[in-house]
């Protein structure tokens, strides 16, 4: 219960206001979490509307089952399954898709989930602990090259190669020391390698982010769900995405820009601009948390919300 109480939904009012353009429409909350956005969306919807939410976390599913509203349903799966899951429910078009990316406060604050370096716990990091490979299992087999690429690309960590070598060296000591399977030891290994310190940031921050993104296939799933959302949105429907680090935001920004721009055509070809297909999206805005929200919830500090609208049928 304590974790539930500590969770604060970021950009709650702004996201819901941007999302709901048709009170009687069909909406998707791709990241139910602890239900802050879903409950606020339901409060704005008409009796005939529908809200379909997704989450991989079994605890989120438990929370969602407490919502006794005939307009609401929850899918225990990644938002990457959105297209097929909605088709199975007879939904061809939606009025809006909301994505609140990243890891939630209850997940970070629970040492047993293995997301945080701030408290020792099992090295898991899976959004759904019942599926897939844990962080410890991946670290037990990954090569120096794979470790380097993941930590460099997903953590933007300049000491990625040195960290990868240290992790493989630690693995060679498994017979004597046992497996590397706790967040505390991982943070300690990274701390010994990363000699420079970013103000206000633990040396292990980037490595933990990178491993979490890899274990959960977060960026690949994000690209899949953006494509799905574009095809599912009806004319006038909104795509609202909240991201918390530059890797996610870059993907969202480029996606929206690419689909809000006219296709590039060789100037030498005899094609008039009016004959080109119209871009499917219009970018509405980019928003950030207010100073008051950041003061009340420091984890909101890095949030960026981007909104786009489908303008073609």
UniProtKB/Swiss-Prot annotation:
Subcellular location: Cytoplasm
Known EC number: 2.1.1.199
Keyword rRNA processing carried by entry: yes
Pfam families xrefs: Methyltransf_5
Residues that hold S-adenosyl-L-methionine according to the record: 35-37, 55, 79, 100, 107
SUPFAM superfamilies: Putative methyltransferase TM0872, insert domain (SSF81799), S-adenosyl-L-methionine-dependent methyltransferases (SSF53335)
Catalysed transformations (reactions): cytidine(1402) in 16S rRNA + S-adenosyl-L-methionine = N(4)-methylcytidine(1402) in 16S rRNA + S-adenosyl-L-homocysteine + H(+)
Keyword terms: Cytoplasm, Methyltransferase, rRNA processing, S-adenosyl-L-methionine, Transferase
Gene Ontology BP terms: rRNA base methylation
Leader sequence residues: none
GO cellular component entries: cytoplasm
InterPro entries attached to this UniProt entry: RsmH, SAM-dep_MeTrfase_MraW_recog, SAM-dependent_MTases_sf
Disulfide bridge positions per record: none
EC primary class: transferase
Domain of life of the source: Bacteria
Molecular function terms, GO-annotated: rRNA (cytosine-N4-)-methyltransferase activity
Predominant localisation class: cytoplasm
Function of the molecule: Specifically methylates the N4 position of cytidine in position 1402 (C1402) of 16S rRNA.
Entry similarity comment: Belongs to the methyltransferase superfamily. RsmH family.
Protein name, UniProt field: Ribosomal RNA small subunit methyltransferase H
Organism of origin: Burkholderia cenocepacia (strain ATCC BAA-245 / DSM 16553 / LMG 16656 / NCTC 13227 / J2315 / CF5610)
Protein encoded by which gene: rsmH
């Amino acid at each position: 219960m304590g974790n539930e109480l500590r969770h604060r939904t970021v950009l709650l009012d702004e996201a819901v206001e941007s999302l709901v353009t048709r009170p009687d429409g069909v909406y998707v909350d791709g990241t139910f979490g602890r239900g802050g956005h879903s409950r606020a969306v339901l409060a704005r919807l008409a009796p005939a509307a529908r809200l379909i939410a997704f989450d991989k976390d079994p605890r989120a599913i438990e929370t969602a089952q407490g919502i006794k509203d005939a307009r609401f349903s929850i899918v225990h799966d990644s938002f990457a399954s959105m297209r097929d899951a909605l088709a199975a429910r007879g939904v061809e078009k939606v009025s809006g898709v909301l994505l609140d990316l990243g890891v939630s406060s209850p997940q970070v604050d629970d040492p047993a989930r293995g997301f945080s370096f701030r408290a020792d716990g099992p090295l898991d990091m899976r959004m759904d602990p019942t599926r897939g490979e844990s962080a410890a299992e991946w670290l037990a087999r990954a090569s120096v090259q794979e470790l380097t690429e993941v930590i460099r690309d997903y953590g933007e960590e300049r000491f990625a190669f040195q960290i990868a070598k240290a992790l493989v060296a630690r693995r060679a000591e498994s017979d004597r020391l046992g497996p590397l399977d706790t967040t505390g030891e991982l943070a300690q290994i990274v701390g010994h390698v990363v000699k420079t310190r970013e103000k206000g940031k633990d040396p292990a921050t980037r490595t933990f982010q990178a491993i979490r993104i890899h274990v959960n296939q977060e960026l690949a799933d994000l690209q899949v769900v953006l494509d799905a959302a574009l095809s599912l949105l009806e004319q006038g429907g909104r795509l609202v995405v909240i991201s918390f680090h530059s890797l996610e935001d870059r993907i969202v920004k480029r996606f929206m820009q690419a689909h809000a721009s006219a296709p590039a055509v060789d100037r030498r070809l005899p094609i008039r601009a009016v004959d080109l297909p119209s871009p499917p999206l219009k970018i509405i805005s980019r928003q950030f948390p207010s100073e008051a929200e950041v003061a009340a919830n420091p984890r909101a500090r890095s949030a960026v919300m981007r909104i786009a609208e489908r303008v073609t049928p």
